From Swiss-Prot:
It is a multi-pass membrane protein. NDH is composed of at least 16 different subunits, 5 of which are encoded in the nucleus. GO terms for cellular component: chloroplast thylakoid membrane. This is NAD(P)H-quinone oxidoreductase subunit 1, chloroplastic. It comes from Cucumis sativus. Coiled coil: none annotated. It is found in: Plastid, Chloroplast thylakoid membrane. Belongs to the complex I subunit 1 family. One of its GO terms (biological process) is photosynthesis, light reaction. The keyword Ligase does not apply. One of its GO terms (molecular function) is oxidoreductase activity, acting on NAD(P)H, quinone or similar compound as acceptor. It catalyses: a plastoquinone + NADH + (n+1) H(+)(in) = a plastoquinol + NAD(+) + n H(+)(out); a plastoquinone + NADPH + (n+1) H(+)(in) = a plastoquinol + NADP(+) + n H(+)(out). Keywords: Chloroplast, Membrane, NAD, NADP, Plastid, Plastoquinone, Quinone, Thylakoid, Translocase, Transmembrane, Transmembrane helix. InterPro entries: NADH_UbQ_OxRdtase_su1/FPO, NADH_UbQ_OxRdtase_su1_CS.
Length: 363
């Protein structure tokens, strides 16, 4: 069989087209992921700057002002400094656990962002079990902290890891029960469906008004999960030096630093999605997202507005978290566990029973 030159050229052009098709297919998958990662990184940098400025205002002192205008580049300067610091390893510790621990903490939190709707039609994975996938993934992070504490071969680090695991278990259950109540009210566990269920009734349809007890419990539990004051027992400086972070330096210490703010941001986003209506502005006749389906310009404008609304609600909760840090004193470990097991757990169970009864009688 003889193949002429034109047929060979056709075969080569076809193979090039197939390669370009596969390349653009991979690129189409990577672009949303990379965009989300970039947005999360910028969000964390903004949180660090806001915390320093708000903390300085509460304490009546001057915050960061030299790294960039108004000190906006201070977090970037700190990260660069940690990047070039030496990574020290404990001489008698388990270096494998010591090195893997920070990575597990960061990766488990980053995966949680895949189910968060940042705006109208802006979610990486709209899964039917979105909120419970977040709870399942976030429960992996304390394992990384416990590995870090054990691998450090330091009594303060090990106690900090144990405290982190105990605290996470104590407050994960009330938080899960609150999420289950929201899922029952919305008849779905998808984060997108939960937001759309709230948007049907406007401002008064927010789960903040329908689940006020659950909102307070979720707020307290999320602060405890983020290990923020008054719940920062795993790294209490006066008792444990720095807890599970005591033996860390350089980029590994920076990973814990990033993980704490990533966790704070993801908790704030879930407060917005579950209780504050998500991307919906909740003002009738002002912003109807069905109008944005007319053409691409309206669609992009609608997505931009929805992202802005989501972030505005999220950073409002972040302000409350930062102000709480400098308002309330740290609890003792027995007070922390008693609050979770003897107070929040029974109330969250009662709230779930009331929600279930309401849903059954409304059928």
């Amino acid at each position: 069989m003889i193949i002429d030159t034109s047929q060979v050229q056709d075969i080569h052009s076809f193979s090039r087209l197939e390669f370009l098709k596969e390349f653009y297919g991979i690129l189409w998958v990577l672009v949303p992921i990379l965009t989300t990662v970039l947005g999360i990184t910028i969000g964390v940098l903004v949180i660090v700057w806001l915390e320093r400025e708000i903390s300085a205002g509460i304490q009546q002192r001057i915050g960061p002002e030299y790294a960039g205008p108004l000190g906006v580049l201070q977090a970037l300067a700190d990260g660069t400094k940690l990047l070039f610091k030496e990574n020290l390893l404990p001489s008698r510790g388990d270096t494998r656990l010591f090195s893997i621990g920070p990575s597990i903490a960061v990766i488990s939190i980053l995966l949680s962002y895949s189910v968060i709707p940042f705006g109208y039609r802006l979610v990486l994975a709209d899964l039917p079990i979105g909120v419970f996938l977040w709870i399942a993934i976030s429960s992996v992070a304390p394992i990384g902290l416990l590995m870090s504490g054990y691998g450090s071969n330091n009594k303060y680090s090990f106690l900090g890891g144990l405290r982190a695991a105990a605290q996470s278990i104590s407050y994960e259950i009330p938080l899960t029960l609150c999420v289950l109540s929201i899922s029952l009210l919305s008849n779905s566990s998808s984060t997108v469906d939960i937001v759309e269920a709230q948007s049907k009734y406007g401002f008064w349809g927010w789960n903040l008004w329908r689940q006020p007890i659950g909102f307070v419990i979720f707020l307290i539990s999320s602060l405890a999960e983020c290990e923020r004051l008054p719940f920062d027992l795993p790294e209490a400086e006066e008792e444990l030096v720095a807890g599970y972070q005591t033996e860390y330096s350089g980029i590994k210490f920076g990973l814990f630093y990033v993980a704490s703010y990533l966790n704070l941001l993801v908790s704030s986003l879930f407060v917005t999605v579950l209780y504050l209506g998500g991307w919906d502005i909740s003002i009738p006749y002002i912003l109807g997202y069905e109008l944005f389906e007319i053409n691409k310009v309206y669609e992009v404008f609608g997505m931009t507005i929805s992202i802005f609304i989501t972030l505005a609600k999220t950073y409002l909760f972040l302000f409350i978290s930062i102000a709480t840090r400098w308002t309330l004193p740290r609890l003792r470990i027995d007070q922390l566990l008693n609050l979770g097991w003897k107070f929040l757990l029974p109330i969250s169970l009662g709230n779930l029973l009331l929600t279930t009864s309401f849903q059954l009688f409304s059928l």
